[in-house]
């Protein structure tokens, strides 16, 4: 089993004595986060989001409240109501973000990073989607393996809550976790998650350099730009600018632009199409050398 010291060395926590908010569902990842944060000397406040989507959700909330009571720390239970159905994961994620403190730390692990990278890849994401979560200070456990975290929780004498929906094959992430990644391990004859995490870090480093080189582009709004000038840009630069602009103008943040949408938007800028439909019922059009988003 990985020692507590080795786990702490892999974490990217703020200095000991810092007051932090933790998002704690009661599952092994977030419980491991809370235990390690306290072992590191952080002053924690626990935040639990009750989606009221599972029969056991009230028990999860009571479990987290009990942890806070035993540890003598503050806890905040956020009640949200997310109805089961289509796009549940995205809607639940948006609901959590709406109520949790912006800087709340989460228990995302290296395995979550690998899964998200692959999910974004098959969704058609660009460079940003291929380096998800990297560099995010609210995700201090991205170098920690999920299995090591679960073993640590047990070794500390805790029994984490289990969410049965994490085994539901209707959710794409679960299939990526339980079917695709094990198959990739078998085909590659090695553990591929660390390789994916390493690739994500390399892509993130490239993104940072590109962002610095194109920082001035960020000041140009979608509606002020002249399409004739945009069309003269290198394709990679224009593609990056369009992706950023479309993401910024997504009203609820639940429809990040896919690669196919960005490519169609390129065609609009270059005059190859008058307009194109985007996710979320939006429409990008070109009129008199300028763009509009409806």
List the model feature ranges, each with a label.
Residues 1-182:
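Core alpha/beta nucleotide-donor-binding catalytic domains of modification enzymes
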Residues 40, 71, 187, 249-253, ...:
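Solvent-exposed amphipathic alpha-helical surface segments
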Residues 100-103, 184, 214, 293:
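Enrichment for repetitive, rod-forming helical segments
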Residues 109-261:
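Flexible helical/loop "lid" subdomain adjacent to adenine-nucleotide binding pockets
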Residues 2-29, 45-51, 80-82, 178, ...:
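AMP-forming adenylation/ATP pyrophosphatase catalytic core
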């Amino acid at each position: 089993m990985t020692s507590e010291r080795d786990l702490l060395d892999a974490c990217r926590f703020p200095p000991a004595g810092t007051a932090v908010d933790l998002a704690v569902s009661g599952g092994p990842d977030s419980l491991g986060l809370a235990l390690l944060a306290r072992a590191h000397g952080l002053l924690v406040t626990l935040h639990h989001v009750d989606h009221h989507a599972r029969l056991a959700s009230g028990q999860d909330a009571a479990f987290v409240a009990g942890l806070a009571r035993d540890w003598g720390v503050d806890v905040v239970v956020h009640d949200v109501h997310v109805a089961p159905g289509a796009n549940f994961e995205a809607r639940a994620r948006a609901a959590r973000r709406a109520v949790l403190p912006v800087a709340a730390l989460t228990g995302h692990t290296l395995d979550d990073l690998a899964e998200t990278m692959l999910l974004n890849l098959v969704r058609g994401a660009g460079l940003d989607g291929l380096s998800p979560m990297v560099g995010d200070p609210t995700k201090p456990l991205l170098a920690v393996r999920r299995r090591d975290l679960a073993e640590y929780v047990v070794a500390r004498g805790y029994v984490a809550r289990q969410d049965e929906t994490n085994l539901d094959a209707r959710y794409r992430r679960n299939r990526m976790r339980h079917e695709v990644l094990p198959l990739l391990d078998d085909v590659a004859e090695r553990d591929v998650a660390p390789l994916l995490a390493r690739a994500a870090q390399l892509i993130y480093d490239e993104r940072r350099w590109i962002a610095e080189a194109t920082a001035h582009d960020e000041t140009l709004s979608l509606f002020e730009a002249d399409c004739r000038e945009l069309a003269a840009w290198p394709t990679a630069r224009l593609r990056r600018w369009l992706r950023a602009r479309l993401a910024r103008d997504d009203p609820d943040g639940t429809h990040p632009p896919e690669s196919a949408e960005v490519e169609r938007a390129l065609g609009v800028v270059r005059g190859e199409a008058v307009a194109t439909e985007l996710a979320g019922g939006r429409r990008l059009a070109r009129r008199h050398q300028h763009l509009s988003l409806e």
